[in-house]
Structure formats: structure tokens, C-alpha cells
Amino acid sequence: MKLSRRDFMKANAVAAAAAAAGLTIPTVARAVTDAGSDGITWDKAPCRFCGTGCGVLVGTQNGRIVASQGDPDAPVNRGLNCIKGYFLPKIMYGKDRLTQPLLRMKGGQYDKEGEFTPVSWDQAFDVMAAKFKGTLKEKGPGAVGMFGSGQWTVWEGYAAAKLFKAGFRSNNLDPNARHCMASAVVGFMRTFGMDEPMGCYDDIEQADAFVLWGSNMAEMHPILWSRITNRRLSNDKVQVAVLSTFEQRSFELADNPIIFTPQSDLVILNYIANYIIQNNAVDQAFMDKHVNIRKGATDIGYGLRPTDPLEKAAKNPGSDASEPMSFDDYKAFVADYTLEKTAKMTGVPQDQLLALAKLYADPNIKVVSYWTMGFNQHTRGVWANNLCYNIHLLTGKISKPGCGPFSLTGQPSACGTAREVGTFAHRLPADMVVTNEKHRQIAETRWKIPAGTIPDKVGLHAVAQDRALKDGKLNAYWVMCNNNMQAGPNINADRMPGWRDPRNFIVVSDPYPTVSALSADLILPTAMWVEKEGAYGNAERRTQFWHQQVKAPGEAKSDLWQLMEFSKRFTVDEVWPAALLAKMPALQGKTLYEVLYVNGNVDRYPLDEVPADRLNDEARACGFYVQKGLFEEYAGFGRGHGHDLAPFDAYHKARGIRWPVVDGKETLWRYREGYDPFVKNGEEVRFYGKPDGKAVIFALPYEPPAESPDQEYDLWLSTGRVLEHWHTGSMTRRVPELHRAFPEAVLFIHPLDAKARGLRRGDKVKVMSRRGELVSIVETRGRNRVPQGLVYMPFFDAAQLVNVLTLDATDPLSKEADFKKCAVKIEKV
């Protein structure tokens, strides 16, 4: 089926309207999915794309996926998919799908400068194991590392965490969720002592107002946006406010569309807190019972190398310190953020700021705040999260139907795998951390490994991994289920030089020859989505399972198979010091596979528990139900203290279940009596992630970005996504309809900025920052209408690597890069 761009956009509009009206799948979608054809077998799965967690029905025939449609029984999307979801089958069958391992070779041997040559899995793992063993022997665990994914299944991430943190004794494991959700994680932990939202999508149908902070839900979370649209259009009292540094699709529904100067969201948040206090809108009873106030450290730097002038100038680089503060002192602190000052610093008219503050302050208006990368990809992203929580805590508009702060995720299992499993460099499962001795002991006991196996120091985060690769300190490196060479910041500074450094051996596991894969030394072909059994955890704490439905092409293998098979190449004697092994001499001579995955926990469920009519390549390769074993071992970390997951088998029968799950019942609103089983009768609200059960309001000021426009580099650059493509486009650009709809990246620029530079729509233009340059196409119209002084460019296009321009400044607390703010200049080509 062929769609013009006009038809494509019309189809998406139809989809949104259908959702708002409660209709079934639009005609164009039925044509694409070929629903109802004879001989098609249907089964459920969560969508492969964003963190919304939509349910789809996958149609298979003769060993191939031939159709998909929205699952009418899925509570998230109620039968509707966005335009990407309708084309899911086609992401599996790109013409350049990888089907066998490829190793750089010259003269029949591995060579860093050689050509990619097909090899067997044994050959691939022989070379790879030799490189990892050599590095471990010569330099130790700190020289090996892995960059994983929020697209991993739950058990893939868990298996990876065990292999690196226990097997190789290296905490140098970090997910690409570092680039998108790390600020949200640290924000949750600082304020509440536990990660992830307290609310759920059911808030949408009960809220009176929605405030979007740096979130273009209309394009990035279109199914949730359709539910908000339905709520707004069916009740004229419902209001929508959208805050962004440029006008985008979500503005079409906004009652209060706000464009602010980059970084000044911090000012707006403090102004709202000030307004609430000055107008006696504080829920004082809630504050007295459930909230503490602390003053946070300031001037904390920008996460750059210690030699950078900005880091040298910082008074408290990387500091997470805070001290108790009285309410009166907090009141005085935010009093500086007046309406007049805020309007001047942000460029937002006073009447719009006042209207926004009144939404939050009115005790009769239930408000949900949503945010994504505008908050998180921010050099003060953690602070932005904390300041938003302040507003909800001051007003008591939290942890109850229709009220709450909600961080939306961009990947299908950034929550379920990266965060809950603990595949960050500092984390273990269920919000535990490697720096806590008790937490390490819990993990070591559950994993049946010697005390002291897991290192007590935080490993290298994403940007630090890039720097260590360039510096020759990280030498054996495995990248799995992501395209970080294209997606990460400041490509030319550290990452590309590090990957191509002859001291380093780089492995990439991927279904397609991405920019990352083609920059590596060894490419391992990977099974995708329903070519394996899997589990994802979405943004509302909903865990969803699916069965394997087709086989992967050629010799492609799942990430789980790759991790476990690779572990067979190492004995504990080769990777653990003798003193450690002496604590458990019975483990001597065993492989990491035997110690980590055949430990009496993971292998406890026999193969006959896999339904005979179901595909499950990994289980049959292992000889036991490996997914169930991994999941149940992992779930044991969280049960009993607010991270409770249901039994494995329950998920295959359900359309997802939201944790904590106690006595078979899911939890919709956490921390609230009557909804959360961990809040006792009479407590009303208890933020039990904190020892005293109280959340924390943080006093945090505005601080400037790491880089701003000047006379030479006179424009802000912001990067992001578009509706048609997901992240780096490695899947969506292989769908002809999606590719044709948005074939290449463009540079969105204000018409007056273009005119001042002698540019017209469609002109080729060179975009330059202090770090790199590229050529793009001028776009002065369309969906993104940027203000003067700012340009916007999506990052899906491998031919226009926008991240050669971006700065690798990070939030010093979360280590998440700021992709939304750097300075560029442009000139006509």
C-alpha cells in the first residue's frame, strides 16, 4: 500500500479523531494490517516503540508477521495504534536485515582496519572472548563495559546485569535510558526515595487540567494525547497548558500555549511555588504531615571533563548535598521569583504565567503534569523534576485520581528494564544501589555468589564510557540494542575516536547495519521483538509479556541467547581473584553460565512448562524455561517492599499488570491509603521510600545553561523526534511508507531568521557548532514553528548526524546529556 505525505498525515488525524470519538481502527489502518485475512494467527504483544505500552495484535502466517492491529482489549490504547504502530510488521523485514555475524578481517584474521566478513557464531565469540579475557587479565574489570538499552526485555537486562556486575565484576554497565530517563530517576529518588510515577494513565479521564512541560505528546505519545484530546473536547471546563521552547503539534489543543527561553523553565517552576504560597493556596495540613523541606547545593557544574573551564569554575561540582530548611526560609527563597522577574527572564507574557499558576493553586482543579525530554535532557534536569514535585506537594495534588506529576518514558522498557531491573552503572534491582553494602549483600545472596563479588564503586555512565574509550581506559566494549553512535551527544569528541582506537575492541548487537554497527569491529545479528519471548515495563508501571511468534531470520539470535552463550566462554577461575573464589570453592572450574544462570534459581522451571505449541528458542537452547527462571529470581528482589511483581504466569494471561501487585491486585495510585497496600489504614498518604514516610521539597535556583548563543554562534539548537520516526530511525526508516512521509531531516527555522541570512525554504544550509558541522535543508513552515533565535532538528537521519553539533554537558546528578540547548551558526551552501 502506498501513502503520500498528505494521505499519511490525514491518516494520523483520522486515528486521533477515532480515539477521541471512541471508534475502532480507521480504514487506512485496516488496509495496512490486512486484518481478518484467512489463515492468519493472532496473538498479543506490546508495541515495539515508545514507553506508552500500547497493546497490539500480531498476525502471523507461514512463519512471517503479515499483519498487526490495535488490541481492543488493551487498556492503554483500547484498539488504537499510532501510525508507527500500524506499520510494525514492516520493521522486521528490511532488505538489509543482518543474518550472520560480521567481523572486520584482513588476510583471514581479525583486523581493526579490515572489511566486515561473515563468520560463524563460534568464530565471533572466540575473537570476542579473547579480547575480553585479555583486557580483564591485563587491566582488570574496570576496562570492560557494556552499553545496553531501554528496549531490552526485562530478562535480557537482568541477564546482562548479572554477567557484568557479578560475572565480570564490572559496574561499567549503563543503558541508553541514561540519555532519556536518568534525570527522572534521580528526581524521583531525591524527592520520594523510590523511582517511577505514583499515578497512572487513568488520571487522564479524571483530571481537570493537563500541563505539558517540554513534552510534545501529540507526536511522541500520540495515543495518550488522543485520550487527553478526548477529555478536553468532551468537557469544556478541562484546560490544557503546553510549555515548550518552540511551537509544536501539542499547541493545537492548548488553552495556554507558552513558549519560553531555553533553561528558564526553572524560573517558571519557582514562580508557581511562590504564587501558591503568596496566595495562601498551600495545603498546610498535607505539608505538615507528609513533607520535609531541604535546601540543595548550588553551582554544581555541568558534568564536563574536570579540565573544562566550566567545571573548574564550579564551587560544588557534582554535589547532591542538601540541608534542612524551614517553611519560612523556603517562602523567602521563592519570593525572589516574582511575576515581573519571571516574565522578563522567560520571555513569557505575565497573563500566561498567571493563568498557569492559578491552575495549580486552585484547590478545585485536579492537575496532572506531564514531561519528557524537555525536562530530562537538561543540565539541571533533576532540579526541574524536583521543582515540579514541589508544586504538587505544596498543593497536595499528588497520589490521587486526576492529580500528580508524571514523567513519560520514550522507550518500551526504560522503566521495566533500565530502571526496575537496575541496568544503570549505579543500580541493582528494585531501586538498590551498588554503593550500599546491604544492597550488595542482598544481591550476592540471591545470586548465590561470594560476598564481595559486586564492586562497591559506581561504574562508568554513558558519557563517561565515551571518554574512557577515547582515553584508552575502556578497551572491551559491547553495545546492545541501541544506536549510540548516532544517538549520543558530541559524536566527534570522544565516541568516534574511542571506537576506532586500535586499543579498543567494539562489539555491536543489532538487527540492522546502523551507524553504530558500521563503526564497530564485530557485528552480531539480533532477533527482534516477537522473534523471542519478552517482557516490557511501560511508563505507568505496567509489566506486559508476549510469546515468541516467529523465528528470527538466518543466524540472528536474541540478546538473551547472546549474553548467556557468551558467558559459557569464561570460567570463574579466569575472571575472579583467588581470594574471592576461595569463599565458595565449590564454584571452582565452573563457567559463568553455570554460576549465574544454572544456579538452582534460573534453571528451576522445566522445559515442559513452555507450551508445546509455542516457539521459545532460548528456552529450548537452555533446556529449561529460562525466561521464567530469570524473571522469578529478579522479582524476588522487590516483593514485600513496594516493588512487588505478580507471578510470571499471570502476565501471559493479562494485558499488563501495574506494580506493586499484592494478593493478585494491581496498584493504580501509590502512596495513597485505599489504593496502595503498603499504606496502612489511617495514614492517608505515606511516601514509604523515605525512612520517615515524608517526601522532600527542594529549594533550588535558576542556573544558566552550559552554552548559550553569542555573536558568532548566534542561534539556539534543540534536537528531538518527529511523529513518523522513532529515535535514530533504524527501524522506521526501513518502512517505505514512513520513510516517504519524512524522508530526511530538515532544519526548522523562523522565516525572519532565514530571511536575515539570505535563506529560503528548501535551501541547503551548513549548520556549525564549536564541535562539528553538517549540511541540512531549510524548513520555514510545517509542524514545528520555532521562535526567532532558535532552530530545531530531528536526529533520525543517519545522513545528517545532528549529534556532531551537540554538547556533552550533562546534569551533574543524573549524568544525562542536554540535547536541547547548544549554540550554532548557519550559512548557505
UniProtKB/Swiss-Prot annotation:
Mo-bis(molybdopterin guanine dinucleotide) binds at residues 84, 151, 176, 180, 213-220, 263-265, 373, 377, 483, 509-510, 532, 559, 719-728, 803, 820. GO terms for cellular component: membrane; nitrate reductase complex; periplasmic space. It is found in: Periplasm. Binds 1 [4Fe-4S] cluster. Residues 40-96 form the 4Fe-4S Mo/W bis-MGD-type domain. It comes from the Bacteria. Its cofactor is [4Fe-4S] cluster; Mo-bis(molybdopterin guanine dinucleotide). InterPro entries: Asp_de-COase-like_dom_sf (IPR009010), CT_Nitrate-R-NapA-like (IPR041957), MoPterin_dinucl-bd_dom (IPR006657), Mopterin_OxRdtase (IPR006656), Mopterin_OxRdtase_4Fe-4S_dom (IPR006963), MopterinOxRdtase_cofactor_BS (IPR027467), Periplasm_NO3_reductase_lsu (IPR010051), Prok_molybdopt-oxidoreductase (IPR050123). HAMAP family: Nitrate_reduct_NapA (MF_01630). NCBIfam families: NAPA, PRK13532.1, TAT_signal_seq. Component of the periplasmic nitrate reductase NapAB complex composed of NapA and NapB. Catalytic subunit of the periplasmic nitrate reductase complex NapAB. Receives electrons from NapB and catalyzes the reduction of nitrate to nitrite. Belongs to the prokaryotic molybdopterin-containing oxidoreductase family. NasA/NapA/NarB subfamily. This is Periplasmic nitrate reductase. It comes from Edwardsiella ictaluri (strain 93-146).
